[in-house]
């Protein structure tokens, strides 16, 4: 494969670009009027690349085996593309109303002149293609993980309705959808990331005399990652007779400094509200 030598210099990769393309024996089956500079074309056809590459599974496996051999770190950023498989859902996520500032909402909105705002004439068939793409993509994420590959969690936020903080938690959910155990996902999001960045002091987890970088959560994320969302979750009260709102990161401790996350969320909400009338 032509990727063999190039992969030696590829210490980390983000997204999924280049992996399925490298497995194809030729060019992707683009229509004759395809224009990469037209982002509707670009992202519409991106929905078919993994399905096409999946016809050459042994070649895909060779690409991944070369990445594994070279100890390449992979940051898939599944969350930022999720709007392609369910556009109306990501546009109406419950945190947007309170926590997405007007200027960012305008940047998200479809516009031919802005990157990653290509959702005009986005079709049912496009979403179906992307759903299939995710199934195959996740299968290879699991293969990479099962064979010793290092994954990290990123979100590439501020595009396609992916909102800071919330999108990272959604990325953890998508790793779980790919078949990875929540304990391993926490490692992907924490110590794996520090090792990749060269933060050796922070890469060994919680231990005595280590830097106090902790998140204190109202709930058990190993049971349900949704308890980490700032919007929280609904659950039965202890007596089982009513619904209560709980969850969310209560406190963040960074370098020994304690931050009240609920207070910070209130400040964000107040700022977002202040921008609505301008």
PLM regions and their residue ranges:
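Functional cores that coordinate and move charged inorganic groups
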Residues: 1-10, 17, 24, 36
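Glycine-enriched alpha-helix->loop->beta-strand junction motifs that scaffold or abut catalytic
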Residues: 7-13, 71, 148
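Alpha-helix termination/capping residues and helix-transition junctions
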Residues: 7-10, 179, 246
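Conserved beta-strand positions in the central sheet of alpha/beta enzyme cores
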Residues: 12-14, 75, 216
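Active-site neighborhoods of metal-dependent hydrolases
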Residues: 19-178, 275-277
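C-terminal helical cap
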Residues: 119-129, 134, 139, 147-150, ...
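C-terminal cap of metal-dependent C-N hydrolases
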Residues: 211-272
């Amino acid at each position: 494969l032509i990727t063999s030598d190039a992969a030696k210099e590829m210490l980390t990769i983000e997204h999924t670009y280049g992996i399925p393309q490298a497995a194809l024996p030729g060019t992707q089956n683009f229509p004759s009027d395809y224009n990469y500079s037209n982002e509707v074309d670009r992202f519409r056809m991106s929905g078919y690349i993994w399905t096409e590459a999946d016809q050459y599974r042994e070649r895909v496996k060779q690409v991944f085996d070369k990445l594994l051999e070279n100890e390449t770190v992979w940051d898939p950023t599944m969350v930022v593309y999720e709007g392609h498989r369910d556009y109306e859902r990501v546009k109406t996520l419950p945190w947007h109303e309170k926590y997405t500032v007007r200027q960012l909402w305008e940047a998200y909105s479809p516009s031919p002149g802005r990157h990653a705002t290509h959702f005009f004439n986005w079709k049912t068939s496009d979403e179906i293609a992307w759903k299939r793409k995710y199934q195959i993509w996740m299968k290879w994420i699991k293969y990479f993980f099962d064979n010793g590959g290092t994954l990290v969690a990123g979100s590439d936020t501020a595009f396609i309705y992916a909102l800071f903080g919330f999108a990272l938690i959604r990325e953890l959910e998508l790793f779980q959808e790919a078949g990875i155990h929540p304990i391993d996902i926490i490692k992907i999001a924490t110590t794996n990331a520090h090792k990749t960045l060269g933060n050796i002091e922070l890469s060994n987890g919680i231990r005595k005399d280590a830097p106090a970088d902790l998140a204190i959560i109202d709930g058990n994320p190993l049971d349900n990652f949704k308890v980490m969302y700032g919007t929280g979750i609904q659950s039965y009260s202890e007596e089982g007779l009513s619904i209560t709102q709980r969850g969310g990161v209560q406190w963040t401790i960074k370098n020994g400094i304690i931050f009240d996350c609920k207070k910070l969320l209130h400040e964000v909400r107040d700022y977002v509200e202040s921008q609505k009338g301008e």
